[in-house]
C-alpha cells in the first residue's frame, strides 16, 4: 500500500510539473518596417483561471519567450507605445512558436499609458528602457529635460550619470550622435521625438563582434525616436536680448587689493548688453539624417563639452595614456567649461547615412567648432591644518582665456558579405588656447596677520596649439561555424602640442617692509609630441551551443617626447643673447611597450551571461630625462569577470570584477629635482613599483511591471596595492642642488604605499504618485575613501565619509504644465590619521544642499509662465562657516501662431541678484573655499520657434512633408531654447 501511495504521489508531481512546463515564443515586429520592436510587453491570461497571468518583454530583434505555462487556452495581448495593442487567442501545448507577430503603428500615446502603467520601464539583460510617454514634459522641451525625470539618471552641470556611472556617448536609433559630446547630443533633439530611452553598457568595437567582453566598455544612452518622426524636419530656434544694470559679478576684494605688485587688467567680466541666439535643425529622410546645432551668446550658456587635448583646464591632457599605450578611453578628453563668464560661439553638424542592400555601407560623422572667451575674477581662502603646519593663505586672482576647438569624428562600416566586415574610425581635433592670469596671495600663520609671513605671486601669459589625429581599423571574419571568429584591428594616434609662455613668480626672497616679493621672470617654449600604435588579434571558438572560448593578443607602443626650453629674463621677457637655464629646461624621451596575451571564456544562455578572461602582460619602459637613462620591465597577471543574471524579466543583476595596473612614467621615476617653482620643489623616485588595482561593480535593477516602479542598487569597491602617493615635507631646510641652497615651503616626492580603498553604494527608487499625477524619484548613497600619503616622513591616511540624498518630483499631467521639484544634499566627514583624539581639526565636517524648482505652465489663451528657483547652502561645522544664496528666474510669455509653435517671453534672470559661484574642497591637510565670477541680475526678452514638419513614413520626397510644400504660412523663425538661464 505504501509503495502504491508513493507511486501515485510521484505521478501527480510529474503530471503537475509537465502541466507547468509549456513555453511560448514569438517575434514582435513593426508591420511597416519589419524591424523588431524591443521592449514591448507580451501578456498571457489563462482563460480557465483569469487570475493567472504571465508576461515578459521583448528582447533583441523583438524576440520574446514566456515559460512555466500550463497547457491550455490563453488570451494574449502585446502592448507598446506608438502601436495599436495586439490581441489574439493562443493555445499552449508544450513549446508553442507563434512566429512573427506584427504591430500596427498609430495608437495615441495616452491610450496606451492609461491601459497599462507598466510602460514606465522595462528590462532586457543589462538594458533598462524608459518609455518617454510616461514622463510628460513641455511641448518645447529637449531630451535633457526629459531624461532628468527618469529614475536612476541625473544631470549635473551637463554631466550625465546613469545607474551611478558617467554616460560617455549618446546614440540615436542605434547610431552614434555627435561623437563623445553628450551635452550637445542631449540639447539637439526635442523630447517630442523620443519614443523611449535605453540605458545600457556599450561594449568595445572588438567585444561587440566577438561577444567576449574585454572590460573596455562604457555606459551609454540610446534614444529611440517615434517611427512616425523618422521622416521630417524638426528642431528649435531662439533669439534674445537682455540688459544688466549692475555688471559687477565678481567676489569681494581682499584687503591687499592695492598692493603695488598686483595690477588687475580685467576690468569687468561681463557687459550691460546681453544676447543669446541659437537653435538646432534635424532633417531625417529614412536612412539619411542631418542635424545642425548653433549657439552664440554672452550669458555663459555652454550646452557642449569641449575637447581639452592641451590639458589647460586641469581636466585632462598631460599624456595619451589612461593605461599603458592604450590611448585615452571614451570621453576622456571631453571636459566641462572653466570657471568665470564666457562669450560663446559654436556650430555642429551630424550626419548619418546608409547605402546598399540591407544597409551594407554605413557612414556616421560629426563636425563641431566652438570658441569661448572666458573672464574670471577669483578669491581663495585656504587653511593648512594638522598634520600640515597651521598656515593660512588668502589669494586673489584674475584670468582671461581664449579657447578654440575644431573636432571631426567619422565612422565607416562596410559589410563585405555575410561573413566579412570592415570598420574604421577617424578622429581629428585641433585646439588653440591663449591664457592670461595673475594671482597674488599672502601666507601667514594660523591667524591672519600673525606669525610667519610670505608673499606669493604668479603672473602668466601664453599661447598654446595642439593637434590630435587617430585612425582605427578593424577587420572581422566569421569562419563558417557560428561563434568561430577572427578579429584583427590596429590603431595609430598622433598628438603634437606647442606652448609658448611667459611667467613672473615670487621666490622665497621678500622685501617685507614694502610687502613686495622678489620676482623671477621666465620665458619658455614647450613642444611635445606623442605617437601611439596598437594592434589586436582575437580568435573565438564555440565549444557548445551556450559557451565559447577566446584567445587574445594585444600589442601597444607609445613614443613620447617632451621638451621645455626656459630662459630667466628681465621684465621685458627678451631672450636675445641668453642661454637656456639648465635648472628650468628639460628634455624627456619615453618609449613604452606592452605585450598582453590571455584566454577567455563566455557562457550565455537566455538572458544570463558569464565572461571571464585572464591576461599576462609584459611592459617595457625605456626613457631619458636630462641625459639620465631610465629602464624598467614589469610583469603582471590581470583578470576580468563579468556576469549578467536575470532572475526573471523584472530582476537583473550585473557584476563586474577586474584588475589593472598603473606603471610609473619617466617623470615619476626621474632622480632629478624640479626647481621651476622654488617654493614647491619636487623630485621623482627611481625605486617606484607599479600599482595594482582591484575593482568590483555590482548593479541590481528591479522593475515592477504592474505598478510602474523601478528600484536600482549599485555597489562598487576599489583596492590598490602599492598605491603611488605623495610624500611631503614642509619647511625642509638647506637642499643643495647644483651648488644652490633651497629652503622651500614644501618638498614632495613619490612613494609606494598600501592602504588605498574606495567604497561606494547607491540606491534609487522611482514610482508614480497617481493621486497628484507625478513621478517621484528617491535616491541615497554612501561613499568612503581612504588615501595614504606621507607627511614629514610619517604615514597619514586621509579618510572621507560622504553621504548623499536626492529627491525629485516631476509632473506627469500634460504638456501644458511641466514642473520639477528637487532637493539634494551631501554631508562629508574628513579625518587625518596623524591628528589624534580631540585635537583641533582632527576632523573636517561640512554639509551642502540644494533645493530647486522649475515650472513651465501654458494657461489661458496660450499665455505661459516659466520660472526656476534654486537655493544653495554650504555649512562648515569645523570652522563655523555658512554660505547660502537664492537664485530666482521668472518669465511671462505668449504662445504664437496656429499650432503654438512660436513663443515670446519677457522676464528677469536672478531676480534677487544673489548668484554666487562657490566651491569648498578638502584635501590632505587643508580646507579651501573658492569664489568665482558670475552673471548677476538682468532683464530679457526672447523669441522662440519650434520647427515641426513630419512626412509620410518611408517617403523619400521633400514634398510629402506636412507643411513643407504649402504656399504662405509661417517661415522658420528664431526661437525654441528655454529662456536665458545661465548654467
Question: Where is each model-derived feature located?
Answer:
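Signature of Gram-negative outer-membrane beta-barrel scaffolds
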Residues: 522, 548-651, 835-842
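Surface-exposed loop/turn segments flanking beta-strands in extracellular/periplasmic regions
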Residues: 126, 302-331, 375-394, 441-456, ...
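Short, acidic Ser/Thr/Gly-rich low-complexity loop/linker segments typical of extracellular
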Residues: 47-63
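Outer membrane beta-barrel strand-and-loop segments of large Gram-negative receptors
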Residues: 396, 532-534, 578-586, 683, ...
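Membrane-proximal, glycine/serine-rich, low-complexity loop/turn segments characteristic
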Residues: 13, 20, 61, 77, ...
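Short, ordered, surface-exposed loop/turn motifs in non-cytosolic proteins
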Residues: 32-47, 121-123
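A short, solvent-exposed loop/turn motif at the edges and junctions
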Residues: 48-51, 73, 77-89, 119
Amino acid at each position: 500500500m505504501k509503495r502504491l501511495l508513493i507511486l501515485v504521489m510521484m505521478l501527480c508531481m510529474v503530471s503537475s510539473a509537465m502541466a507547468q512546463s509549456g513555453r511560448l515564443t514569438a517575434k514582435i515586429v513593426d508591420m511597416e518596417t519589419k524591424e523588431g520592436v524591443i521592449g514591448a510587453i507580451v501578456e498571457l491570461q489563462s482563460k480557465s483561471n483569469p487570475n493567472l497571468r504571465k508576461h515578459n518583454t521583448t528582447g533583441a530583434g523583438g524576440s520574446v519567450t514566456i515559460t512555466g505555462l500550463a497547457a491550455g487556452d490563453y488570451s494574449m495581448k502585446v502592448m507598446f507605445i506608438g502601436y495599436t495593442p495586439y490581441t489574439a487567442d493562443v493555445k499552449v501545448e508544450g513549446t508553442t512558436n507563434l512566429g512573427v507577430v506584427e504591430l500596427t503603428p498609430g495608437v495615441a500615446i495616452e491610450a496606451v499609458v492609461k491601459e497599462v502603467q507598466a510602460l514606465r520601464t522595462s528590462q532586457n539583460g543589462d538594458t533598462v528602457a524608459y518609455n518617454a510617454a510616461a514622463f510628460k514634459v513641455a511641448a518645447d522641451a529637449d531630451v535633457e529635460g526629459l531624461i532628468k525625470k527618469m529614475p536612476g539618471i541625473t544631470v549635473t552641470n551637463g554631466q550625465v550619470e546613469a545607474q551611478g556611472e558617467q554616460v560617455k556617448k549618446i546614440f540615436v536609433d542605434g547610431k552614434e550622435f555627435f561623437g563623445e559630446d553628450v551635452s550637445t547630443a542631449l540639447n539637439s533633439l526635442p523630447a517630442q521625438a523620443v519614443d523611449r530611452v535605453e540605458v545600457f553598457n556599450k561594449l568595445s568595437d572588438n567585444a561587440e563582434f566577438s561577444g567576449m567582453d574585454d572590460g573596455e566598455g562604457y555606459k551609454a544612452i540610446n534614444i529611440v525616436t517615434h517611427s512616425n518622426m523618422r521622416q521630417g524636419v524638426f528642431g528649435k530656434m531662439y533669439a534674445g536680448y537682455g540688459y544688466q544694470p549692475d555688471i559687477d559679478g565678481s567676489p569681494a576684494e581682499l584687503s591687499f587689493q592695492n598692493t603695488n605688485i598686483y595690477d588687475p587688467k580685467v576690468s569687468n567680466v561681463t557687459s550691460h548688453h546681453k544676447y543669446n541666439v541659437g537653435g538646432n535643425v534635424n532633417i531625417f529622410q529614412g536612412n539619411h539624417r542631418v542635424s545642425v546645432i548653433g549657439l552664440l551668446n554672452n550669458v555663459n550658456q555652454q550646452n557642449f563639452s569641449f575637447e581639452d587635448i592641451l590639458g589647460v583646464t586641469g581636466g585632462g591632457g598631460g599624456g595619451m595614456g589612461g593605461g599603458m599605450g592604450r590611448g585615452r578611453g571614451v570621453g576622456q578628453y571631453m571636459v566641462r567649461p572653466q570657471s568665470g563668464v564666457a562669450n560663446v560661439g559654436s556650430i555642429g553638424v551630424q550626419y548619418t547615412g546608409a547605402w546598399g542592400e540591407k544597409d551594407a555601407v554605413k557612414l556616421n560623422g560629426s563636425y563641431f567648432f566652438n570658441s569661448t572667451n572666458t573672464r574670471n575674477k577669483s578669491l581663495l581662502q585656504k587653511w593648512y591644518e594638522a598634520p600640515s603646519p597651521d598656515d593660512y593663505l588668502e589669494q586673489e586672482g584674475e584670468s582671461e582665456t581664449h579657447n578654440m576647438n575644431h573636432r571631426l569624428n567619422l565612422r565607416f562600416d562596410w559589410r563585405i558579405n555575410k561573413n566579412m566586415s570592415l570598420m574604421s574610425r577617424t578622429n581629428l581635433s585641433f585646439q588653440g588656447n591663449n591664457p592670461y592670469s595673475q594671482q597674488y596671495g599672502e601666507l601667514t600663520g594660523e591667524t591672519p596677520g600673525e606669525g610667519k609671513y610670505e608673499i606669493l605671486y604668479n603672473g602668466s601669459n601664453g599661447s598654446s596649439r595642439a593637434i590630435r589625429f587617430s585612425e582605427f581599423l578593424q577587420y572581422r571574419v566569421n569562419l563558417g561555424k557560428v561563434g568561430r571568429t577572427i578579429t584583427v584591428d590596429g590603431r595609430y594616434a598622433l598628438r603634437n602640442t606647442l606652448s609658448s609662455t611667459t611667467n613672473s613668480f615670487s621666490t622665497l626672497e621678500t622685501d617685507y617692509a614694502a610687502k613686495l616679493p622678489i620676482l623671477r621672470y621666465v620665458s619658455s617654449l614647450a613642444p611635445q609630441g606623442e605617437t601611439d600604435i596598437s594592434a589586436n588579434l582575437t580568435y573565438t571558438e564555440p565549444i557548445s551551443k551556450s559557451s565559447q572560448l577566446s584567445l587574445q593578443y594585444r600589442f601597444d607602443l607609445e613614443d613620447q617626447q617632451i621638451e621645455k626650453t626656459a630662459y630667466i629674463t628681465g621684465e621685458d621677457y627678451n631672450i636675445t643673447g641668453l642661454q637656456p637655464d639648465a635648472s628650468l629646461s628639460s628634455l624627456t624621451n619615453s618609449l613604452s611597450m606592452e605585450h598582453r596575451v590571455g584566454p577567455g571564456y563566455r557562457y550565455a544562455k537566455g538572458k544570463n551571461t558569464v565572461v571571464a578572461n585572464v591576461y599576462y602582460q609584459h611592459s617595457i619602459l625605456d626613457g631619458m630625462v636630462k641625459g639620465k637613462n631610465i629602464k624598467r620591465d614589469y610583469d603582471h597577471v590581470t583578470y576580468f569577470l563579468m556576469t549578467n543574471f536575470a532572475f526573471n524579466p523584472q530582476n537583473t543583476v550585473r557584476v563586474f570584477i577586474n584588475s589593472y595596473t598603473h606603471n610609473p612614467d619617466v617623470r615619476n621615476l626621474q632622480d632629478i629635482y624640479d626647481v621651476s617653482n622654488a617654493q614647491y620643489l619636487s623630485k621623482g623616485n627611481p625605486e617606484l613599483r607599479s600599482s595594482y588595482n582591484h575593482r568590483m561593480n555590482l548593479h541590481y535593477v528591479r522593475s515592477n511591471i504592474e505598478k510602474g516602479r523601478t528600484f536600482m542598487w549599485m555597489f562598487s569597491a576599489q583596492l590598490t596595492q602599492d598605491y603611488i602617493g605623495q610624500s611631503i615635507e614642509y619647511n625642509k631646510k638647506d637642499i643643495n642642488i647644483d651648488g644652490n641652497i633651497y629652503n622651500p615651503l614644501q618638498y614632495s616626492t613619490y612613494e609606494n604605499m598600501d592602504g588605498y580603498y574606495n567604497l561606494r553604494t547607491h540606491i534609487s527608487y522611482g514610482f508614480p504618485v497617481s493621486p497628484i499625477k507625478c513621478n517621484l524619484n528617491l535616491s541615497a548613497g554612501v561613499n568612503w575613501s581612504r588615501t595614504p600619503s606621507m607627511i614629514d616622513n610619517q604615514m597619514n591616511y586621509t579618510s572621507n565619509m560622504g553621504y548623499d540624498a536626492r529627491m525629485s518630483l516631476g509632473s506627469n499631467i500634460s504638456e501644458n504644465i511641466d514642473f520639477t521639484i528637487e532637493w539634494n544634499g551631501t554631508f562629508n566627514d574628513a579625518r587625518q590619521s596623524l591628528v589624534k583624539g580631540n585635537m583641533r581639526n582632527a576632523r573636517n565636517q561640512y554639509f551642502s544642499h540644494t533645493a530647486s524648482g522649475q515650472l513651465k505652465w501654458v494657461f489661458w489663451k496660450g499665455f505661459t509662465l516659466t520660472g526656476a528657483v534654486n537655493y544653495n547652502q554650504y555649512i562648515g561645522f569645523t570652522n563655523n562657516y555658512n554660505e547660502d544664496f537664492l537664485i530666482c528666474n521668472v518669465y511671462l510669455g505668449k504662445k504664437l501662431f496656429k499650432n503654438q509653435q512660436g513663443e515670446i517671453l519677457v522676464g528677469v534672470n536672478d531676480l534677487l541678484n544673489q548668484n554666487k559661484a562657490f566651491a569648498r574642497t578638502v584635501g590632505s591637510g587643508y580646507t579651501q573655499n573658492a569664489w568665482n565670477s558670475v552673471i548677476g541680475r538682468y532683464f530679457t526678452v526672447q523669441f522662440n520657434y519650434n520647427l515641426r514638419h513630419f512626412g509620410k513614413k518611408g517617403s523619400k520626397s521633400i514634398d510629402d512633408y506636412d507643411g513643407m510644400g504649402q504656399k504662405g504660412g509661417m517661415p522658420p523663425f528664431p526661437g525654441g531654447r528655454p529662456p536665458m538661464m545661465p548654467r
